[in-house]
């Protein structure tokens, strides 16, 4: 049986029954916003502005410490630049999985390619002799993101931009399971 969360009546009054999309015209069309406890999955075309919409969805963060924006394709500096441009809050939590992946996985692959093409230099051999030759760096970004969002408390707001990163690297059934877990967490913590 799922745990039951008791909501403070003052919180219910403050947060209301719906959360803003961050786009007033869209909020009006959607009768005030998205109902609390709902999860949204948007399927968009490349170049349709989904990254901007994802950021804008975090902008009406009622509690910045309970708001999380996870980007899989943009860097920290680009995200900050956009938030500053539109005067959105900068005190929300941001995680840039794409940057993390590039620095941990792709840099090693690039180095391995260089070794294959150019061979080893004496400095490379000395450096490698001081480290383990086989790195055990299997990072499970999907589980990390799931746990990070599930740690958020009531009335949280989280955006994952985008699921493509996970679908390209994981079994799709694991990604769907993550979305279902997040849906249950959202319903519980509305």
Predicted segments with their positions:
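Short amphipathic alpha-helices and their capping/turn segments at secondary-structure boundaries
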Residues: 81-82, 87-91, 144-153
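Phosphate-binding/switch loop-helix module in NTP-utilizing enzymes
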Residues: 103-183
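P-loop NTPase motor core
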Residues: 75, 90-112
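Catalytic-core regions built around general acid/base machinery
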Residues: 57-61, 177-188
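Glycine-rich P-loop/Walker A and Walker A-like loops and their local beta1-loop-alpha1 context
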Residues: 24-76
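AAA+/P-loop NTPase substrate/partner-engagement loops
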Residues: 72-84, 101-102
């Amino acid at each position: 049986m799922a745990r039951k969360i008791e909501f403070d009546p003052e919180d219910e009054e403050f947060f209301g029954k719906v959360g803003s999309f961050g786009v007033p015209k869209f909020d009006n069309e959607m009768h005030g916003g998205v109902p609390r406890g709902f999860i949204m999955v948007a399927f968009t075309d490349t170049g349709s502005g989904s990254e901007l919409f994802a950021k804008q969805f975090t902008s009406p963060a009622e509690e910045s410490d309970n708001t999380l924006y996870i980007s899989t394709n943009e860097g920290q500096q680009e995200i900050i630049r956009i938030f500053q441009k539109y005067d959105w809050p900068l005190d929300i939590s941001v995680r840039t999985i794409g940057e993390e992946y590039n620095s941990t996985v792709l840099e090693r692959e690039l180095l391995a390619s260089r070794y294959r093409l150019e061979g080893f230099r004496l400095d490379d051999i000395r450096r490698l002799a001081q480290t383990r030759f086989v790195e055990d760096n299997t990072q499970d970004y999907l589980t990390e993101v799931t746990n990070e969002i599930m740690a958020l408390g009531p009335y949280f707001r989280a955006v994952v931009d985008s699921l493509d990163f996970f679908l390209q690297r994981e079994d799709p059934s694991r990604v769907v399971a993550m979305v279902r877990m997040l849906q249950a967490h959202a319903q519980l913590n509305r």
